[in-house]
Amino acid sequence: MTVSKKVEENIFASKLGPEYVGFDHITWYVGNAKQAASYYVTRMGFKQIAYRGPETGSRSVVSHVISNGQAIFVLTSPIRSMAGTGAYDDDPDVTKADRRLLEEIHNHLIKHGDGVKDVAFRIEGDIEAVWKRAVDHGAAPVAAPTTLKDDRHGSITLATIGTYEDTVHSLINRHDYSGPFLPGYEVVTDDDPINRLLPSIDFIEIDHCVGNQPWNGVDPIVKYYEDCLNFHRYWTVDDLNMCGEYSAMRSIVVASPNEVIKMPMNEPAQGKKKSQIEEFVNYYNGAGVQHIAFRTHDIVTAVTRLRERGVSFLEVPSAYYSDLRQRLSHTGLTLEEDIAVLEKLHILVDFDEKGYLLQIFSKHVLDRPTVFIEVIQRNNFDGFGAGNFKSLFEAFEREQARRGNL
């Protein structure tokens, strides 16, 4: 176990620009949306809020929309294959737009497996102005601004731009829309009976969403966010502090002008063996979303209940908590939580003179060692747990070694 020392991390000042509201939703492309949605309902207490499929007029693609607090996942799958050249050219049920979407989803699944396609941002201001600035500065214009309406809930404006690899950002203004998700989706009010039998999980929102890049990929994508979306460098720490015994990485966090959206970007750094970032890029076949962090007011209760629901987390050696007790004894900071309970649950702690952060990382939620989930509680602390990186890397390295990928 490597004893953590005080890590030098840099947090930068914010910029003006109030239009960003937060993360709107995360869209996944998966092989079986119904089963994928059921996993998050069963394991993490999500509830289905909307649905799109053949019953709603979507003849080729199905989407299950689930939420926990303000965190929204959209699990999307094709329900038709793309076998054969010119598939569905003569099928009146499959439009040209359907064929394009089917091809996009199938290609994504072939290349990446199940994974995140769209990290959508909610914006209160002018979608067209944000989209135009992004496109003028080099962002791929995936979908121009458009307004969708339904008679019951009003109208919604959205547009989409490309970001790293095959990932995109939808830009959404919900000011004039009262529905649970988007026009064209059927509202779902019936909760899964499993949620009446299992303890509830209370997430507040998506705290951050992390993108893994290949070697030397961070600086170009950070410049993209600065130029295209007027984001700025919010936080950074070097590879000397983000390492384990065998591997290392480099990370920069970019944030929206008003800092309500934060996007850490990671890349591999030189080490003795393959890093977790390299493993991700190899199995995902490129850059992509590595993990999504859910913020909660009470991580002890949340993690206790997640474990009861069957979620598996990375394990932290007891030496970490001996070191934590020693470091805390030299400060004036007192944790509200019992360290013995944190140790039992394998929850990590980082702190400074102003406050502290509690965090824990799940094991991968897919068979491919790509995407996982973080649960985080912030107590007057805006960093990203730099003091825990060495311990985290060692935990990841143990899992990599079990898979034969270290």
Swiss-Prot record:
It is an enzyme of class 1 (oxidoreductase). Its cofactor is Fe cation. GO terms for biological process: L-phenylalanine catabolic process; tyrosine catabolic process. Binds 1 Fe cation per subunit. Pathway: Amino-acid degradation; L-phenylalanine degradation; acetoacetate and fumarate from L-phenylalanine: step 3/6. Residues 22-174, 205-363 form the VOC domain. Keywords: Dioxygenase, Iron, Metal-binding, Oxidoreductase, Phenylalanine catabolism, Repeat, Tyrosine catabolism. GO terms for molecular function: 4-hydroxyphenylpyruvate dioxygenase activity; metal ion binding. Its EC number is 1.13.11.27. Fe cation binds at residues 208, 291, 374. InterPro entries: 4OHPhenylPyrv_dOase, 4OHPhenylPyrv_dOase_C, 4OHPhenylPyrv_dOase_N, Glyas_Bleomycin-R_OHBP_Dase, Glyas_Fos-R_dOase_dom, VOC. It catalyses: 3-(4-hydroxyphenyl)pyruvate + O2 = homogentisate + CO2. SUPFAM superfamilies: Glyoxalase/Bleomycin resistance protein/Dihydroxybiphenyl dioxygenase. The keyword Repeat applies. Belongs to the 4HPPD family. PANTHER family: 4-HYDROXYPHENYLPYRUVATE DIOXYGENASE (PTHR11959:SF1). NCBIfam families: 4HPPD. This is Probable 4-hydroxyphenylpyruvate dioxygenase 2. The lineage of its organism: Eukaryota, Fungi, Dikarya, Ascomycota, Pezizomycotina.
